């Protein structure tokens, strides 16, 4: 794979996300040449000191500097399709080497003439909006300002397979998992 950020070194302790398994880097190869370290945007192959099942779309992170996982995000989205955006519809999201499903809900649309925030239920061609995006599962991410590779995505129409939008992750929505319903009667 390609290193999205940081570096990998021989004997470095890493974590596989989203599974959480840990191992150490055993060997690193660039083309057919064995190397000791690899850096951002370098395409490499590596081996681990343990047998861990890795799948396309898994991430290898340093155990001392792990990425966050979330399934809900505030994003900026530009709509690039003549067919209007349908809020709450499940769209296909392509991020780096991952293909996922998510629902997108508009918070507000930007008026590109004066940058005011306007309420809207639809997006038309070339509209830009702030949206909440909810994935079917937790994903590894970084905000676009930190890492453009892990913080950007394209939106694909599930019926036509056409690219209909593109966007960037601004931040994760921290929803509590320990909320308890309170009867107010």
How should these model regions be labeled?
Residues 1-185:
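C-terminal effector/interaction modules appended to NTPase cores
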């Amino acid at each position: 794979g390609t290193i999205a950020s940081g570096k990998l070194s021989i004997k470095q302790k890493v974590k596989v996300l989203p599974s959480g398994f840990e191992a150490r880097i055993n060997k690193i190869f660039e083309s057919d040449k064995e190397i000791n370290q690899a850096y951002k945007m370098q395409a490499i192959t590596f081996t681990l000191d343990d047998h861990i099942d890795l799948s396309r779309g898994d991430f290898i992170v340093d155990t001392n500097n792990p990425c966050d996982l979330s399934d809900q995000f505030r994003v900026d989205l530009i709509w690039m399709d003549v067919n209007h955006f349908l809020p709450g519809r499940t769209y296909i999201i392509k991020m780096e080497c991952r293909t996922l499903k998510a629902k997108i809900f508009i918070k507000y649309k930007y008026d590109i003439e004066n940058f005011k925030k306007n309420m809207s239920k639809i997006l038309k061609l070339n509209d830009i909006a702030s949206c909440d995006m909810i994935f079917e599962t937790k994903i590894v991410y970084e905000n676009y300002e930190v890492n453009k590779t892990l913080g950007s995505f394209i939106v694909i129409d599930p019926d036509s397979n056409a690219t209909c939008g593109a966007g960037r992750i601004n931040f994760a929505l921290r929803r509590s998992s320990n909320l308890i319903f309170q009867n107010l009667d």
